[in-house]
Regions:
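Accessory RNA 3′-end/elbow-binding domains used by RNA modification enzymes
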Residues: 1-14, 20-37, 41, 45, ...
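Catalytic cores of RNA-modifying enzymes
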Residues: 1-171, 175-209
Length: 299
């Protein structure tokens, strides 16, 4: 029986291509059944898209939890139903463009844990349906504000009415919403004109595979090990006997973990392959949470 390909691909998504298009191309090129991305990028956006293949699809949520880094460009004086330049854009009349210092101060007010309303054209679920589907159907609905975390925002360029920022944020943050909210603060509106995701955690655009490279016959050689998806977790190295027990879902006591302050750990076998992600209980008992076969080739 042919061994299932397993691992991660870090891809530089081009503009005009959907995240699903990227997954479809990977799936076709590698001839795999299980394949999924770890965080949607809109067609307008470019940059880092992590695609999980094979058993690594079980780790999608861990990649989604990683910090995101973006570079976004915006234009004052416009509003849009999508909060970006690709929607139904309207010009705002009779407004004054803010000074750079005021824009910087306003951006700084977004740093921290804030309440943010997602765009109506987004993948947020509303009564079991995607918000963008309801918006396209012309349905009336309201989205509730959600708490998101913005760790850093820097105004890189300000050539009124255009401006560009660098942003470091947590999962669930909508960059379009930040631009919209800033435009509302100044009473002049703002839409996003370009967006690039420069990194997710340690996955950086400089290391990413291009759209064209996804057609190369040696694409499987570019798979990164599954353990990279949990690189932010503490690591526990175990011997072969222990790894076999964990692979079968057995709970094992590790006395040295009793006084640890973390709840989850990435468990590696002697060859540094990811065996599982395990939950640590207060007693030092380690309970496998997500198991990946220790003999999987590309883990």
């Amino acid at each position: 029986m042919k061994e299932e390909l397993t691992g991660l691909l870090v891809i530089d998504k081009p503009q005009g291509v959907t995240s699903r298009d990227v997954v479809n191309r990977v799936q076709s090129a590698l001839k795999v059944k299980r394949c999924g991305h770890a965080g949607t990028l809109d067609p307008l956006a470019t940059g880092v898209l992590v695609v999980c293949v094979g058993r690594a699809t079980r780790l999608v949520s861990f990649v989604q939890q990683m910090k995101k880094y973006y570079r976004g460009s915006f234009r004052f004086g416009l509003t849009s139903d999508t909060d970006d330049i690709e929607g139904e854009v309207q010009e705002v009349s009779h407004f004054a463009l803010p000074e750079r210092s005021l824009v910087e101060d306003a951006l700084n007010s977004f740093v921290g844990n804030i309440q943010q309303v997602p765009p109506k054209y987004s993948s947020v679920m509303v009564s079991g349906k995607r918000a963008y589907d309801l918006a396209r159907q012309g349905k009336k609905f309201e989205l509730q504000a959600r708490e998101v975390q913005i760790e850093r925002v820097e105004l890189l360029e300000y050539n009124p009415p255009d401006w560009t920022i660098d942003l470091e944020c947590g999962s669930g943050t909508y960059v379009r919403s930040l631009g919209r909210d800033l435009g509302e603060q100044f009473g002049c509106g703002a839409v996003m004109t370009a967006l690039r995701r420069t990194a997710i955690g340690s996955f950086r655009a400089e290391q990413a595979i291009s759209w064209e490279e996804l057609l190369r016959p040696d694409l499987s050689q570019r798979l990164r090990p599954s353990r990279d998806a949990v690189s932010h977790l503490p690591v526990l190295n175990v011997d072969d006997q222990t790894s076999k027990l964990l692979c079968h879902g057995r709970k094992i006591v590790f006395p040295e973990l009793v006084h640890s302050d973390y709840s989850e750990v990435a468990v590696l076998d002697p060859s540094h392959q990811l065996i599982c992600v395990a939950h640590r209980e207060e007693s030092g008992l380690l309970k496998p949470k997500i198991v990946l076969q220790s003999n999987a080739g590309n883990e």
